[in-house]
Design a protein with these regions (language model features):
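Active-site core of glycosidic bond-cleaving carbohydrate-active enzymes
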Residues: 28-126
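Acidic/histidine-rich catalytic neighborhood
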Residues: 1-45
Length: 126
């Protein structure tokens, strides 16, 4: 499950492989991370409020269907569902590391590979 249409907040894919790529895509990583937070928080609240089991099941089902964060060919956290990142793109925005901060979806303790990919993204972006 992904958002569509979607667009990375700051820019589109760049580089030789993406000259014909559209900036409108399906499932930007930041979108999916925000949706994960919203659904996770709703599930947590539904437990506290003792909402129906079927409602909680529907939230869990949506969480399980979300596209996962992915590590790309340059060992970076992918900004898009497709591996369109360019390691030479020194663009100042890093929306796709929302899962690291301000969210807490990426941690060296719970997801060390994603944490390293987020770190690589920060290093590649300069």
């Amino acid at each position: 499950m992904v958002t569509a249409p979607s667009m990375s907040p700051e820019h589109g894919p760049s580089g030789e492989d993406t000259k014909k790529a559209s900036t409108i895509v399906a499932g930007c990583t930041m979108d999916n991370q925000i949706i994960f937070d919203v659904l996770s928080n709703a599930l947590h609240a539904s437990r506290i409020l003792k909402m129906s089991a079927s409602y909680q099941d529907s939230l869990r089902s949506m969480l399980n269907r979300l596209a996962p964060m992915q590590i790309g060919k340059y060992n970076q956290l992918q900004e898009w569902l497709e591996d369109l990142d360019n390691p030479n793109d020194k663009h100042r925005h890093i929306s796709h590391v929302y899962g690291l901060f301000p969210s807490n979806q990426i941690s060296p303790y719970t997801h060390p590979l994603l944490f390293q990919a987020a770190k690589n993204t920060l290093l590649q972006r300069g």
